[in-house]
Swiss-Prot record:
Tree of life domain: Bacteria
Membrane topology summary: Peripheral membrane protein
Annotated Gene3D superfamilies: 2.40.30.20, ATP synthase alpha/beta chain, C-terminal domain, P-loop containing nucleotide triphosphate hydrolases
Record function comment: Produces ATP from ADP in the presence of a proton gradient across the membrane. The alpha chain is a regulatory subunit.
Name this polypeptide is given: ATP synthase subunit alpha
Lineage, opening ranks: Bacteria, Pseudomonadati, Pseudomonadota, Alphaproteobacteria, Hyphomicrobiales
SUPFAM superfamilies: C-terminal domain of alpha and beta subunits of F1 ATP synthase, N-terminal domain of alpha and beta subunits of F1 ATP synthase, P-loop containing nucleoside triphosphate hydrolases
Length: 510
């Protein structure tokens, strides 16, 4: 066997040339102190604001305070396992979350990890949780309705796709119930094979709620067949403050996927008061200076940058939309507190719920006088505009008169008539939970109310009159509902037919 020296040297040279020194360079720091879910770390000089870092035991955190000699990190998890002197390494990625249709029907935590025991998430894309809102040029004014299925809201405080409508009220006034009914009302739009432009996907973000409450909510969605077009993001009361702070942003990013791909979504933040409290806790522990009510100075920016991401995009950007329904809990109906006034000024209107109305049996307990929708009326259908214009005026007069009527017993006939009509319209706007009405059904019911067909009835009979009329129109006279649904208008011809049907029904009902 002949071994040539030249060959050997050539092979050696080649191997030396191709010798790759695989070295992983990671930037690490050291934990200086840890406590209350906050870690102070020394040595992460190049860390980015909002970057994910990893502790020795695999717990993750987010760098929030970048100071001269150390970094303040909020911990996404328990801080019991983290000790002084442990190493922390950079991940070189800003906090992100999985997005896409693979999340529909799932319950995830604030970082997008599944918590429903149904296996891993089938999502290929990941997006940053905190991104800049769309500018002015890609936007379009709100022009399509986002139906909630509730007469009181769709007629008087209409919400459009791409709008931000605040739901505000004390505890136990039915805020979450309105949100739940809105999700259930989208079921007919999300049927299999429906065009994407019609569908409305739902994202529900639970912040600081009891686990039992969230489980109950998910159970209702499942039973009603609404979970398949919904995503639930849960950061419960037992989760650390950073999770409660980041959850709304995570949910928003999931909703933005639909908005940016020419689809439509609605996101419900339940509720932002608890997110503000979590943010206040983090800020104070990071030793940021407190402001009014001990909230940090940038708590307005916290909510504005979140809610500005809800938008209706124009045709050049796919015509998608993201509607936001933030919920705020007030203390003793105090709308002038810091967080409520902030969010009222950011949103395009508010639905104000009152405890007194709730206990009077007016449910949904919407105070029609204080509630407004600043942009929704341009999204209302023509049919609804025609009937709802009257009901607004009648109810406003009724509220004014009812206040005066308490003082005097001898009222003239016109005032008496106004009070009678008002009390029946108020009764008409009541609606039990889980029974949303389609737009055309709301139109015919309100038409009957504003045209005086309920005036002769006792108030207690209004509900049964409404139910009977609707079952008649859904059955024998379904052509009227079909005409309103297809034209989205109440033509003179349809109105005449409707009038005849209501009149004949009123005679038999009496």
């Amino acid at each position: 066997m002949d071994i040539r020296a030249a060959e050997i040297s050539a092979i050696l040279k080649d191997q030396i040339k191709n010798f790759g020194q695989e070295a992983e360079v990671t930037e690490v720091g050291q934990v200086l102190s840890v406590g209350d879910g906050i870690a102070r770390v020394y040595g992460l000089d190049n860390v980015l604001a909002g970057e994910m870092v990893e502790f020795e035991n695999g717990t993750r955190g987010m760098a929030l305070n970048l100071e001269t000699d150390n970094v303040g990190i909020v911990i996404f998890g328990a801080d019991r396992e983290i000790k002084e002197g442990q190493t922390v390494k950079r991940t070189r990625s800003i906090v992100d979350t999985p997005v896409g249709k693979g999340l529909l029907g799932r319950v995830v935590d604030a970082l997008g990890n599944p918590i429903d025991g149904k296996g891993p998430i089938q999502a290929t894309e990941r997006k940053r949780v905190d991104v800049k809102a769309p500018g002015i040029i890609p936007r379009k004014s709100v022009n399509e309705p986002m139906a909630t299925g509730l007469k009181a809201i769709d007629a008087l405080i209409p919400v459009g796709r791409g709008q931000r409508e605040l739901i505000i009220g004390d505890r136990q006034t039915g805020k979450t119930a309105i949100a739940l009914d809105t999700i259930l009302n989208q079921k007919p739009l999300n049927v299999e094979g429906a065009p994407e432009g019609q569908k409305l996907y739902c994202v529900y973000v639970a912040v600081g709620q009891k686990r039992s409450t969230v489980a109950q909510f998910v159970k209702v969605l499942e039973e009603q067949g609404a979970l398949e077009y919904s995503i639930v993001v849960a950061a419960t009361a037992s989760d650390p403050a950073p999770m409660q702070y980041i959850a709304p942003f995570t949910g928003c990013t999931m909703g933005e996927y639909f908005r940016d791909n020419g689809m439509h979504a609605v996101i419900i933040y339940d509720d932002l008061s608890k997110q503000a409290v979590a943010y206040r806790q983090m800020s104070l522990l990071l030793r940021r200076p407190p402001g009014r009510e001990a909230y940090p100075g940038d708590v307005f920016y916290l909510h504005s940058r979140l809610l500005e991401r809800a938008a209706k995009l124009n045709e050049d950007h796919g015509s998608g939309s993201l509607t936001a329904l933030p919920i705020i809990e007030t203390q003793a109906n105090d709308v002038s507190a810091y967080i409520p006034t902030n969010v009222i000024s950011i949103t395009d209107g508010q639905i104000f719920l009152e405890t007194d109305l709730f206990f009077q049996g007016i449910r949904p307990a919407v105070n029609v006088g204080l509630s407004v929708s600043r942009v929704g009326s341009s999204a209302q259908t023509k049919a609804m505009k025609k009937v709802a214009g009257k009901i607004k005026g009648e109810l406003a007069q009724y509220r004014e008169m009812a206040a005066f009527a308490q003082f005097g017993s001898d009222l003239d006939a016109s005032t008496q008539r106004l009070l009678n009509r008002g009390s029946r319209l108020t009764e008409l706007l009541k609606q039990p939970q889980f029974s949303p009405l389609k737009m055309e059904e709301q139109v015919v019911v309100i038409y009957a109310g504003v045209n005086g067909y309920l005036d002769a009835l006792p108030v207690a009979k209004v509900r049964s009159f409404e139910d009977g009329l609707l079952s008649l129109l859904r059955g024998k006279e379904s052509a009227i509902l079909d005409a309103i649904r297809t034209s989205r208008d109440l033509s003179d011809d349809t109105a005449a037919k409707l009038k005849a049907v209501i009149e004949s029904y009123a005679k038999t009902f009496a």
